UniProtKB/Swiss-Prot annotation:
Extra remark: In the reaction, the free carboxyl group of octanoic acid is attached via an amide linkage to the epsilon-amino group of a specific lysine residue of lipoyl domains of lipoate-dependent enzymes.
Positions of substrate binding: R71, G72, G73, Q74, V75, T76, Y77, H78, S138, L139, G140, G151, L152, A153
Gene that this polypeptide is encoded by: lipB
Keywords: Acyltransferase, Cytoplasm, Transferase
Record organism: Shewanella frigidimarina (strain NCIMB 400)
Record-given protein name: Octanoyltransferase
Main location: cytoplasm
Reaction it catalyzes: octanoyl-[ACP] + L-lysyl-[protein] = N(6)-octanoyl-L-lysyl-[protein] + holo-[ACP] + H(+)
Keyword Coiled coil part of the UniProt annotation: no
Compartments where found: Cytoplasm
Domain named BPL/LPL catalytic: residues: 32-207
GO biological process entries: protein modification process
Length: 216
């Protein structure tokens, strides 16, 4: 039976590694009755290298740390002014395949940007969301025990320069773009509020419960 309630945790600015380990712990200890959660967060500057990542795609990290992680995909950058959203979803209970969850996440971003008259789209061969061949959102998931963790990163109002130190998602010369430059949401808070709406609608959640911080 599909969960009707989505619990949303507003985490603010949190370091990447502790958030990642908290996601792992939640996923490893959840059972068939555990609630689905959506974590809303920003991270200090960090490069994360997914399981498909190749070291040659990290060109010049400089003073920004590089963390090897257990999500799908290749290297990406997180930093202040970027909305990061982690869906901790029991896909088995929600009767979703992995591909459908990815499609739903991408569509929730596309729908949110459409609210601002931004024409965004997904690519079948390169997960994420794009505007005129520039990437505005990255996506990388891990499924364990039939449940998802990791998630999406939407560029809102950030310094995009660190993306030039890597081949984003393994694509040399891939240009990044952000919401603020396109007349989209101007703050991470605004983008998060809108994305919560579109994601919950697409996923069919009837009730949203908001929390500040992680569970005690």
């Amino acid at each position: 039976m599909q969960a009707q309630t989505l619990h949303i945790r507003h985490l603010g600015m949190q370091d990447y590694e502790s958030t990642w380990h908290a996601m792992q712990e939640y996923t490893d200890t959840r059972d068939s009755d555990s609630q689905d959660e959506l974590w809303i967060v920003e991270h200090p500057p960090v490069f994360t290298q997914g399981q498909a990542g190749k070291s040659e795609h990290i060109l010049n990290p400089g003073d920004i740390p590089v963390i090897q992680v257990d999500r799908g995909g290749q290297v990406t950058y997180h930093g202040p002014g970027q909305l990061v959203v982690y869906p901790l979803i029991d896909i088995k209970r929600n009767k979703l395949g992995v591909r459908q969850l990815v499609n739903n996440i991408e569509q929730s971003i596309i729908d949110m940007l459409a609210y601002y008259a931004i024409n965004a789209y997904a690519k079948a061969d390169a997960p994420g969301v794009y505007v005129t061949e520039q990437k505005i959102a990255s996506l990388g998931l891990r499924i364990r025990k039939g449940c998802s963790f990791h998630g999406l990163a939407l560029n809102v109002d950030m310094d995009l320069a660190p993306f030039q130190r890597i081949n984003p998602c393994g694509y040399a010369g891939l240009e990044m773009v952000q919401c603020k430059a396109l007349g989209g949401p101007q703050t991470v808070l605004e983008a998060g509020d809108k994305l919560i709406q579109t994601f919950s609608q697409i996923m069919g959640y009837q009730q949203l419960v908001h929390h500040q911080g992680l569970a005690e």
